[in-house]
Each structure stands twice: as structure tokens, then as C-alpha cells.
Amino acid sequence: FPTEASRLAYSINAYNALVLFAVKRAWPIRAVHDVRGLLEPKAGFGFFWAQLFRLDGRWINLYDLEHDVLRGGFEDARIHAAIVCASGSCPTLSAEAYLPDTLDAQLDAAMRDFTSNPRHVRVDDATERIALSAIYDWFGEDFEAEARRRGAGESVLDAIAHFADERTRASPRRARAAGYTVVYRDYDWSVNLPHDDGA
């Protein structure tokens, strides 16, 4: 690849395309966990580990593409807002491919959409809770490192506030200052369908 941006854009696009292919190949399914391997030692094994795809002359599964290639090869938490595992709690799939020349702006936009969507970040003043996507729990260290790289602070909530749109940005900071409890939502593994983003 001529640049790191080219390699990252290619890898994100490959992940999303392979997920779509895997769902289409297994259709009809209700959830990605419905795809089974010969053995199923844990939920999602068939979809994320057992299916192998030929990519760049080698066999790879979705788990390794996400964790070894994307997370291991690039220190950029915005990846979590760009890759989509075809599940209800995933970020929204971009209608456009990620391109090297516009990658930084595309990743910022994906992260802004993710952090500003009430399905992924919701401040509930009635219960004094901040409900976050499980993605922020699973990959908390990635988001904390992203906040530090951006000079935005050191926490997951700092990363969220940094990327959120103007309408949403103040809510997590205000809620944290008020001592609200952070809770992580259960992950919806059902195959994603169009959402009413007011949820």
C-alpha cells in the first residue's frame, strides 16, 4: 500500500464487505450468532472465528481482521465507528467506501455519528445514568488512548465528548460532573435493520 491511510481504508472496507458477504451467504438468519461452526465454544464463534475468507493471499476470519489487522495495526479508536458487524447495536454502515484521500474526515464523521446517536450514548437525567454502547466497554482502552492522543482528556467519556456533535457534546460532560453512573447497554446481536434513531 502506498500509504497507511490506503491500508486502513482497504482493511475497513474489506471487513465491512466480508460481513455483508457472510450475512448474505447465511441468509436467512435472525442474528449473526445463528451462523454456527462445526464447534461452537462461545456465542458468535461461527460468524467471527469459524468462517474463513481469502484476503491478500491468506485466509483470515473476521475476528483476526478486526483485532490483529485493524486494532493491532492502527492506533485509532474511530475504527470502532467504521466497522460494522451487521448487528443491531453496531454503528451505521457508511453508504460510501472509505477512501485514503478522505479517510480522516470519513472516520471523524463516523465517530461523530456514533457518539451522537442515542442508541450508543444516552444521558438519562431521570435516572442519573449515562447509558453507553457495550462497544465503549469492550474497547475502553482504545477510546481512552484516543482521548489522550487528541488532548481531550483520558476517559471514554472524554473521547465521546470530543467527537460528539455540538448538540450532544455537553451532555456527557455535564452528567459526569454531576456524578451520573455509567452503564453499558446489552449488545443486540440481531441482524441490523433500519433504526428509528430516536431510541
Task: For the regions a language model picked out, list residue spans one by one.
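Interaction/scaffold regions that mediate signaling and macromolecular assembly across diverse proteins
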Residues: 1-199
